[in-house]
């Protein structure tokens, strides 16, 4: 019996990042990229329609950023897990992201294998971390 396939929505305002992540994740047999959004607003619309298991969310985007989009997403779809993928590695941003409801926080210069491990960990966790 094969394990369930993780359905992922990629959210980033940079097309090359979205497409690169989709291509990279598409090579994994246990991951299906169900959609790509370029803003927090579009992420909320697509998540409501596509019901992803995990949203891979950029932190800083024009319009609604990743923090606010995460807050709204976990309110409207608490079964969906959010992992921040960002170029910002500071502790304050990470705490803010976790307080908004994100389950994981990974910087964009993370090794590909570590990104996959973090994504799988976020998908399999049943609890939300607390950040104080």
Regions found by a protein language model. Give the residues of each.
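Active-site beta3 strand of CheY-like receiver
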Residues: 50-56
């Amino acid at each position: 019996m094969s394990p369930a396939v993780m359905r992922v929505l990629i959210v980033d305002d940079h097309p090359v990042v979205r497409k690169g992540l989709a291509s990279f994740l598409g090579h994994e047999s246990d991951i299906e990229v169900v959609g790509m959004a370029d803003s927090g607003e579009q992420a909320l619309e697509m998540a409501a329609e596509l019901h992803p298991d995990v949203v891979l969310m950029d932190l800083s985007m024009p319009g609604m950023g990743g923090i606010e989009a995460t807050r709204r997403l976990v309110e409207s779809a608490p079964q969906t897990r959010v992992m921040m993928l960002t170029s910002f590695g500071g502790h304050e941003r990470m705490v803010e992201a976790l307080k908004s409801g994100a389950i994981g926080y990974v910087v964009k210069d993370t090794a590909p294998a570590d990104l996959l491990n973090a994504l799988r960990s976020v998908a399999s966790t049943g609890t939300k971390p607390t950040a104080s």
